Amino acid sequence: MVIDTSALVCIVLEEPEAAAFASAIFEDSIRLVSVVSLVEAGIVLEKALGRAGSEELEFAIRTLKLSIQPVTVDQGQTALLAHWRYGRGLHRAALNFGDCFTYALAKRTNEPLLFKGNDFGRTDLRLVALS
């Protein structure tokens, strides 16, 4: 699976869905996250928790045994296509910059996406079904 920023933030902030997201991650042997998502999550979590946000994110990465993926040229091209197809102001999915890279990683690896919210549900990606 590919894990979106929204799922990581949910887990670190211990939001109501956190346990379900963590369980879904532990049940899958493939746990990919884009380095762009980690930067985005770090920004969000430091805004919410101060410097401890990055420390909590690092702890979650280790605990969940996430595989951090670099951005490839192919992913960059796919992210741009995702923007034109599903981007904010262009489509009701309203993907932002970081979302486009998550989309690209999921699309290029053909892995289902774990996310919180409605945005990716309006795209053509395979999605993780929570139990």
Spans of features found by a protein language model:
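A general structural signal for well-ordered alpha-helical segments in protein cores
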Residues: A18, L38, S54, G76-L80
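Alpha-helix capping/helix-boundary segments
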Residues: L8, S37-L38, Q75, T102, ...
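Glycine/charged-rich beta-loop-alpha catalytic/anionic-binding loops adjacent to active sites
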Residues: A22-S23, F59-R62, H83-G89
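Active-site neighborhoods of divalent-metal-dependent phosphate/nucleic-acid chemistry enzymes
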Residues: S67-P112
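Short loop->beta-strand "edge-of-pocket" segments that line small-molecule binding or catalytic clefts
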Residues: I30-L32, K65-Q69
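Short, well-structured N-terminal submotif of metal-dependent ribonuclease cores
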Residues: M1-V33, E46-F59, R122, S131
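Acidic, PIN/NYN-like endoribonuclease modules and their adjacent C-terminal/linker elements
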Residues: Y103-S131
